[in-house]
Amino acid sequence: AGTYYYLHRFVYDNPKSEEVINSIWNNMYNAIANVNILLQGIEDHRGILAADEEKIYEGEAYALRAFLHFDLLRLFGKSYVSGAGEKAIPYVSKISKEITPLSTVSEVLDSVITDLEKAAFLLENDPVRTGEATTSFLGTRSFHFNYYAVRALMARVYLYKNDKVNALKNATEVILSHKYPWVEKGQVATTTRDNRDGIFLTECILMLNNTRLETITETYLKKSENNTVGNLLVTQAEVRDEIFENTLYGGSDWRYIYYFEPIDSYYVNTKLWQVSSSYNNRQPLLRISEMYLIAAECAGSKKEALEYFNTLRQHRGFEVTDDLKEEDTTDEKLQTAIGKEYRKEFIGEGQWFFYCKRTDQATLPNVQVPFSKAYYVLPIPDQELEYGNRN
């Protein structure tokens, strides 16, 4: 697509690429500044809010600060496995005119975990756990950084840090809560898109109410008189078949059947199309499927790992006969299969790129240019380097 042509080819110093990268950096740190203002306001005015509400707002703020910094780290810092001790990004934890120094990858992850631990403590009596919301604003907890979203993010962060024990602990807590049931086939396998659940709504632990989704999907995922295929984010038919292992599993995967629409000789991903009012403006950030993949990767035994892995695939249209068997599955084969599921499950969401970065993959399939691991790290904007004395 036009705006992302150079990013798609990892040309980060092109003006169009720099515009996108600078916007990500500036907007996310602006959001962090607003979170810090909120936290300072809560600290300076204790007792104005009811005690239970104050804890929830404060807990959500700590969680959001951690979430924003973690994604900045995944974009602008090296992976933990390739550069734990290398300088990455500033972790801004207070309102100050002073320049925040860069922290290492490991230090950022420690700060993220510290904020998430504070959030989990403050959200202990979250309405998502008690079932009692004192105000309407505190309802519909999947639109807020709720307690289980904190645990899910902790699972993601700990795995990024290669701490599989704590990653498994947090992932299984979310799984065992039974708060996020698998989507029913009838919600996905609809005859038209008018009432199709493209995001598997019941499985969403945390999501955005993104009122710009229609504009985004109309711009990048739908063809019109003024929007040709050359401007769209499209997938070649053979690449779609490869991603979903069509020759091996016969195209039974719901994500293969119901996530795409043909346009000319290509396909576009449709899961975020704004068709049904029941699912409008909903953009998933954390889902129960990721917890199953994390549990599969971190489980203490192969039997347990395969139970998590096969359960996920059975709820995506796979037959029990397609289950991976313990006697036929090496550790390497299981890890490869987990990577393939990340690619299928989070297509169009970016999580598979971060999976490849976390696991230090030397190559990426279907890229337009020869790949280098250097492409995993976005450049910090020049303005930040200049005025932050980062050079």
Name every feature range the model reports, one short phrase each.
Residues 72, 161, 300-302:
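Structural motif corresponding to the intra-repeat A-B loop/turn of tetratricopeptide repeats
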Residues 278, 282, 328-391:
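Long, intrinsically disordered, low-complexity segments
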